[in-house]
Amino acid sequence: MIVKADLHVHSAASWDGRSDLAALAQAAHARGLDAIAVCDHDVCTDVSGEFPVLLIPGVEVTSTAGHILGLFLEKPLDRALWKDGAPTPRAAIDAIRACGGLAAPAHPFSPQKLSDAALAALCPDAIEVQNARVALKNAARNRQAQEFAVQQQLAVTGGSDAHCAAEVGGCYTELDCTERSLAALRAALAAGRTRAVFDHACTWTQKGLSQWHGARRAPILRRCKALAYLCVCVLRDLFTGR
């Protein structure tokens, strides 16, 4: 059976996230998804509870050279990972695997902080090749990730990188599973039985709202910059559609 999962979603536990788990799950259900992976910034959010879709425990680790998704975590990452600041990509992947998770670089070419050779040397479990926010800014970076996955024979994932319920499902992953369960989804990803799907890009307004929300407790100068950016984003959607 094919299970549809958005494997990159942020909740209000992220500094720039704006929706709680219930709203994210309801949005996923309304868009025909079966599961979402909650991957907050450097935080392992508790996803226990009753929801209309499966919630996959995850994290998005900000490393010294890009972001690493941890999917299907069996326990939260040890906070010691961040004791000296941002961890290296290797340390992040090792920590994710130590917690039973699968590691996948997120939007690895937007921006590209590792050479192709260095990225390949990490031997990740999968790689994100469809990201709805990258599709907004530079869709060629998604294509570059797809080409890299083919070259390296890596499992692929797709995720919206949603920071609110309205963004859920912009990109998602189809997993060929034996059943609709976390264990079956994890097994499908580990075996590479996946397909990354692009549905639609994020809007500039949603991206601007994330920046504004993230700056709400920041010093006044940063808040002013975030507000100006939001205004530019709204105008960009209104007058250019890009």
Please report, for each region that a protein language model flagged, where it lies by residue:
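Charged catalytic cores and adjacent phosphate/nucleic-acid-binding surfaces used
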Residues: M1-L7, S11, G17, L21-A22, ...
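Divalent metal-dependent hydrolysis catalytic cores, especially in the metallo-beta-lactamase
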Residues: D6-A12, L24-D42, L102-A104
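Generic structural signal for well-ordered alpha-helices
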Residues: A25, R90-I93
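Short beta->alpha connector loops
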Residues: H41-V43, D84, P108-Q112
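Aromatic-lined carbohydrate-recognition surfaces of secreted/lumenal glycan-active proteins
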Residues: T88, R97-Q112
